[in-house]
Structures are given as structure tokens and as C-alpha cells.
Amino acid sequence: MSEQFRLTRRSMLAGAAVAGALAPVVTSVAHAEGGGIKTNSAATAANIATLERVKVELVKPPFVHAHTQKAEGEPKVVEFKMTIQEKKIVVDDKGTEVHAMTFDGSVPGPMMIVHQDDYVELTLVNPDTNELQHNIDFHSATGALGGGALTVVNPGDTAVLRFKATKAGVFVYHCAPAGMVPWHVTSGMNGAIMVLPRDGLKDHKGHELVYDKVYYVGEQDFYVPKDENGKFKKYESAGEAYPDVLEAMKTLTPTHVVFNGAVGALTGDNALQAKVGDRVLILHSQANRDTRPHLIGGHGDYVWATGKFANPPELDQETWFIPGGAAGAAYYTFQQPGIYAYVNHNLIEAFELGAAGHFKVTGDWNDDLMTAVVSPTSG
């Protein structure tokens, strides 16, 4: 490997090697912090000090932490903690490896749930065992690069960010260090937050929508370099992999497009569970590429394709479009038992690259909805 791309811990923290290879797309942290921002921190602190605080234990996707669908009482300060983990993961049944960058060890990172006008207070920990600098950009937040300018953490650092959740919807969050944003995001460092309206979800007529289950599907594109024989390469570290990964990324052609970190992660024993009659809210994020979720054998009864609950949901959707850098929500009442494939309906990405999962639904079959009038016969 050439000296130009030999990423030591020191050079990665300084950003020199990476910035030389990637023209920074995001304004530098120094510029963001030096913009002459004035704050009313004393008044804000006094107001927030009177609010109830709630500490939430995050859980790994596809599950979400316990929450109420309607806000109870006045806005709260909702406390979360995430620890950044740089870890090697296997993304398919062939043993293909990725040096992933993760929030709390999972791809995607955990789903956070609050109510509109709550304050999100995140403690972000970058252990000294990590090699890279990180931060977090919340698409749900206002100002300072979505919090990215205020959360730059080197190995061994901890930052605490607080922001007011003023917009209702499902929003992406992701790592966004200057000069390295695409690398971190396509290495798995993204997740989503759901900000519920204080009075809960509503249909297009303003009637309440209550869900029985909620699942979080995080779609991830990986770019794994190949050798001259077309086999996926393996590396000792993220820094060693970086120059080859960068070239693979620049093709804009992922080698894997997966749900929840790996091919088949939401199938078989890990299929999402429901019963006939269950009202299920499916949250789906894609931090980098467009996607087209489709439930084979089902529908989106109510769909917020770009995830924003101030807008009325679309009705009876077969497939919905979520642009890259967004998260969507679909609400469906299951009416038949069986295995439902939930896919990105770019079918090449679903069947060849891995963007597929399963719902396993139990209950009684309804012949009125579907029946085999004549079963297939030969001759």
C-alpha cells in the first residue's frame, strides 16, 4: 500500500490523508463553530431544568424501545446514550467481511422515539479502543450541521448533544465527519429517529391510527472491493481497506444492498412476527440511496413515504419511494397468514444483492380474499 494512503491513527484523526483524497463536501467543524453563533444558554437551561427527564434504554433493530404512542403530559428531556463501535462484520453467507462503523454495535443504529417538542439529549461515546473520529448528524435537528459540528469525538472522547424535536416524522441520523462522510455512512454508521405527534398518528381524515407492533428496517449499501479474480478482499483494518473501498464507492455500484446489516438478517428464525389482524408500523431508512419498499402479498394501508407526519398519509400503496437520505413509514393491517416477503422492488437489489426480509404471519386463512379455484395440474 502506498504511503499516500497509509492511514495511521494520527493521520485519520487529523483528517489529512482522507481530506486529500476526498474534497470535503461538508463545511469544516472549525468554520461551523467559528461562525459567531450567539446563544441564550442561560434562559434555555433554566427552562429545561424544570422539565421531567426520562432515560431510555435503546434496543437493537428491528425492534424499538418501549414508548407511548401519545405524549403524556408536558414535553420532556429524553436521555439516550450510544457508544460507537468499529467492528468487523460478515454481510453474507459467503463470509464477506466489512469493517463496519456503527452506533451501538448494530447496522442500522438503534431507533430512537420521542414526541414532538420533546428534547433529545444524546450522550455519544467514542471509546479509546476505536481508531477513527466520529460525530452524529440528525436530520430531525435544526442547526450546527444537524449536531455534527457539536459532536466531533476522537477516540476516548464523549459528547452530550441536546436538541428540540420540532418536526414530527421519521428521520435519518448518520455520522458526518468532514471529508469522510460517504465512507462512514456506507460503512453502516446510520440509523433513524421517530418523532411522534403529541396526539399520535392520524389518517388522512384526522382519525387516530394505533399500531400493535412497530419494526425498524434499515437498508444499507456496502461497497466491498474485489481482487483481480473477482473475489471479495479482506483487510486487517478500516484504514487498510480505505483506498480500495473509496474506489469501489466511486463506481456507485454496491456489492451488497441489505436489510439490517446482512443478507438474510430478517429471514428464517429472524423473520418479523405478526398475527392476522395486527396493525403493524414499518419504519424504513436508507441514508444513501433511493429505495422502493414493497410488501409482497400485502400493501401500505397508510404510507408516509418520506416519513413526515404533518402530511396526510397516502392510501393503499403497492410500492412506495423513499429517497436516499430519508426514512419512511408504512402502516398495514395483516389479513392473511403466511410468509410475506418485504423487499426493495428494484428486484435485482432484492434477489441478487440482499435487500429482502420476511414477515411471518399466523392466523386463519380467509377464502373470501383469495382461494385456489383450480389447483395447478399437469396435462
Swiss-Prot record:
Cofactor binding mode and count: Binds 1 Cu(2+) ion. The Cu(2+) ion is held by residues from each of 2 monomers of the trimer. Nitrite is bound to the Cu(2+) ion site. Pseudoazurin is the physiological electron donor for the Cu-NIR in vitro. Binds 1 Cu(+) ion. The Cu(+) ion is bound within a single monomer.
EC number(s) stated in the UniProt entry for this protein: 1.7.2.1
Residues annotated as signal peptide: 1-32
Gene Ontology molecular function terms on file: copper ion binding; nitrite reductase (NO-forming) activity
Catalysed reactions, semicolon-separated: nitric oxide + Fe(III)-[cytochrome c] + H2O = Fe(II)-[cytochrome c] + nitrite + 2 H(+)
Statement: the UniProt record of this protein carries the keyword Repeat: yes
GO biological process: denitrification pathway; nitrate assimilation
Essential cofactor(s): Cu(2+); Cu(+); FAD
Binding-site residues, Cu cation 1: 134, 175, 184, 189
Ranges of residues in domain Plastocyanin-like: 33-214, 215-379
Main enzyme class: oxidoreductase
Principal location class: periplasm
UniProt pathway: Nitrogen metabolism; nitrate reduction (denitrification); dinitrogen from nitrate: step 2/4
Keywords of this entry: Copper, FAD, Flavoprotein, Metal-binding, Nitrate assimilation, Oxidoreductase, Periplasm, Repeat, Signal
Family: Belongs to the multicopper oxidase family.
The protein's name: Copper-containing nitrite reductase
